[in-house]
Amino acid sequence: MKKFALILEILQIKKSLSFEYTDSAYDAELARIRERFIPLVKICKEYGTAMRIGTNHGSLSDRIMSRYGDTALGMVESALEFLRICEEENYYNIVLSMKSSNTQVMVEAYRLLIVKMDAEQMNYPLHLGVTEAGEGEDGRIKSAVGIGTLLEDGIGDTVRVSLTEDPEFEIPVAKALVDRYTNRLEHAPIVDLSFEVKKNKSGLPYNPFEYSRRVSSAVKNVGGENVPRIIADFSKHDKITAANLFGVGYNYSVPLDKWNLTDQACDFIYLGKNKIDFAIPGTLSMIVDAANWRATDDYENTYPYFSSNEFISAKIKSTHLNFIGLTQKDIFENADVILKSIDKTCVLVLETKNTHAMAELRRIAIELMNRNVSNPFIVKRSYNSISSDELQLHASTDFGALLLDGFPDAIWIDAHTIASPQMINSLGFGILQAARTRISKTEYISCPSCGRTLFDLQETTAKIRSRTDHLKGIKIGIMGCIVNGPGEMADADYGYVGSGPGKITLYKGKVVVERSIEAEKAVDALINLIKEHGDWVEKELKFN
C-alpha cells in the first residue's frame, strides 16, 4: 500500500502544480513555439516536402490543457496553432490528423477540426486512424467504428489501420473500409434535411461535436438510464434448443441446475414465428411477431413485434412492451398517424434496406427527435452476400456511427446467412465497447510494431490478455517504446511500456510507478500493481 500512497501523493502534487496561463504567458509560449518551428517549415517549403501535423490525445501540452482541457477542442486548437504558423510562412503542403484510441474523442476531433478550418477558410486533407486500436476482433471493430463513422460523414483522404499484428494484416482492413464506398452513389434516395438545419448547425437535435446520449424514456429495461441492449436474432432457426443460448452468453450448469450469465449475455432474443419449449433464464426476454404473440401464454416475458401498420390497427397489444418497426417511408409518409398511436409502452425499431444504411437510419432518428419523440430507439440492420470479415467492418461502421451520435438504446444485427449467433453476439458487444457505450470486457490499447519496439508486442499482449481478460472495465495500455507510448496510452488505467532492451516501465494512468523492470518479471509486476489499486478480481470458476 506504500506504493499506492506514493502514487496518490504524486497525483496531488501534479494537480497542485497545474496553473492557468495568463494571456501574456500563453502568447509568450506560442512565440517560443513559432521560433523553433519556423526553421522546419522553411526547409519543407524550400524542398517541396509535405508535412503531417498530428495531435495526440494523450500528449496535449500543459498550456493547451489549461485553456481547453483534455478535450477534442484542445486537440483541434493544438493543431491549428501550428497550422496558422505554416500559413503565415505561405506553406500549405500539409496533411492533418487527430490521434486517439478513444473513438468518441477521435470522431469529435475530426468533425470539429473541419468546422474550425471552415471558419478560418482553411481546407487541408485529413489522415484518419484510431491509434493503438489493438489486435484481432477488438482492433478491427474499434478501427471501423472510428474510421468508418468519418467515412460515412464524407470525411477523410487517407486511412491507416493500426493493429497489434504483423503489418501486412492492416492493409486488407483499411482497403475493405474504403472499398465499401466504391458504388455508394447508387443508394436509394434519403430524405434531405431542411435548408434551415443545413445553414444553422445548431438546428440539429443533437451535438455532433460532443458525445451525449439521447434522452429517452425507459420502457422496461430499454432506454432511459439502461445501457444499450443487444438483441439476438433466432427467427431463422428451424428449432431452438437450450444449446442455442450458449452462444449468446448463457451457460446452463447441470450440477447447480441453473443458468449462468456471462458479461456478454444478450438481453432479448427475437424468435419471429418460432417457439421455445424450455425454461429460459429469468433475465432474458423474448420478442415474437405480433401475430404469434397473441397465442403465447407468457405475456410477462414475451413481447410483440409489429410493423407500423399492424400496430395502428391492432386491437390487442402488450400492456408492458411493444416493438414497432419503422422505415423512412413510414416516418415521412405516415408519421402523424403512427406517432399519434404510440404510447409509453412502445420501443421503436428503426429499419432500412438502403445501401447507404447508416445515413438513412440517422435521418429517421433526426426526424423523430425533431418531433420530440422520447420512446427508446433500436437500430436494426440485415446483412447478406458479404463475408464474415466484411460483416465485422460494415456492422461496426453502421452501428458504431449511430452509437457515437448517441441515438440507439439497443442494436439488432441480422446476419444469419453470414455468421453464427455466437460471432454476431460477440460483434454486437464489441461494437458497444468500441463506442464506449457498454463495457463488457477488458480494453487493451496496444500499438503496432515499429522499429522502436523493444519487445515482442504480439507475444506480450497475449500474455497480458491471458492474465487480465476477466477484468471488465479496466483499460490497459501496452506500448512498445517510451517515445510515443505514454502519450498514445491516453486514458488507459494502467500502462506497460518498453523503456529499454529487456526493460519495462509501469504506469498508473499517466504517472510512472516503477522503472526498469526485468521483462521476465514485468507481467507479474503489472498484476501486482492492479491488485494494489483494488482493481483485481479473481477469475470465476466455471461449472458445466
Q: At which residue positions do the language-model features occur?
A:
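Extended, intrinsically disordered, low-complexity segments
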Residues: 176-239, 265-268, 272, 286, ...
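Anion (oxyanion) recognition and catalysis
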Residues: 45, 369, 490
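Receiver (REC) domain switch/active-site residues of two-component response regulators
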Residues: 2, 156-157, 267, 408-409, ...
